[in-house]
Design a protein with these regions (language model features):
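Conserved small/polar residues in nucleotide/adenosyl-binding loops
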Residues: 223-225
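Structural recognition of the beta-strand scaffold that forms the well-ordered cores
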Residues: 39-40, 83, 103-104, 137-139
Length: 225
């Protein structure tokens, strides 16, 4: 009844609906072009596709808002995105061969990043084999992080960083030089906004630091150019 009082609005909605019908007629049943196959790895997999960092109607929380944009960016990018769980890898150790890039996003010891799954030999072996064979691994926050056997980042040899928890205070940390010319930063203008960012992250010797703030690494790469 309320809409009847605004005929121009009703007419506009009718036109928009017709535009969507035309789009659907043109693209139904057609697979869109995708540049790469991307897997988002967490404890839920498909169970929480596209919503793995949203809590209670996506209410803002300081602890996880920095991760929202990653999933949102993937939704509009030309990638074939799948959400897989650690149990999926345990059930099929060759699962990662279907993908070009694996993304692990979240704070340490959460369902988003994986927690104790990263001490499982099958998981570690599958991810390292994937990277060794040319796959890309992107970690945001505290990926593959769980304190175990003297390491916090269980993929430190792939990620190129470690997080100081008071166990390595006397370890020499000389790698602080930034490489702003790196291809990952070529399309950026001005400062990169990391949201809350991360504290106490330091780079290993062979790592290319892209951005560090007050000797706290925020972005890096092990791809040398």
């Amino acid at each position: 009844k309320l809409a009847l009082q605004f005929p121009d609005f009703v007419q506009y909605i009718k036109e928009v609906c017709q535009e969507f019908r035309t789009l659907y007629d043109n693209i139904q049943g057609v697979t869109p072009y995708c540049v790469k196959r991307v897997a988002v790895l967490n404890c839920w997999g498909r169970m929480r596709s596209w919503g793995n960092h949203m809590v209670h109607h996506a209410i803002y929380y300081k602890q996880n808002y920095s991760y929202f944009g990653i999933i949102e960016a993937l939704s509009g990018a030309p990638f074939d995105v799948s959400f897989i769980s650690f149990d999926d890898i345990l059930a099929d150790k060759d699962l990662l061969k279907k993908f070009d890039v694996v993304i692990n996003v979240g704070d340490a010891d959460t369902a988003q990043s994986g927690g104790e799954y990263w001490v499982n030999e099958t998981i570690i072996t599958a991810v390292k084999e994937f990277v060794y064979n040319g796959g890309g691994f992107i970690g945001v926050g505290e990926p593959a992080a769980h304190q175990w056997q003297g390491k916090f980042f269980q993929l430190d040899d792939i990620l190129g960083v470690e997080e100081e928890h008071g166990f390595n205070l006397n370890t020499d940390k000389y790698n602080w030089e930034e490489h702003r010319e790196h291809f990952i930063l070529q399309d950026t203008d001005g400062d990169v906004d990391f949201g809350e960012g991360k504290k106490n992250i330091y780079a290993l010797p062979e790592t290319d630091i892209l951005i560090q703030n007050d000797q706290e690494v925020q972005m890096l790469s092990l791809i040398h150019i």
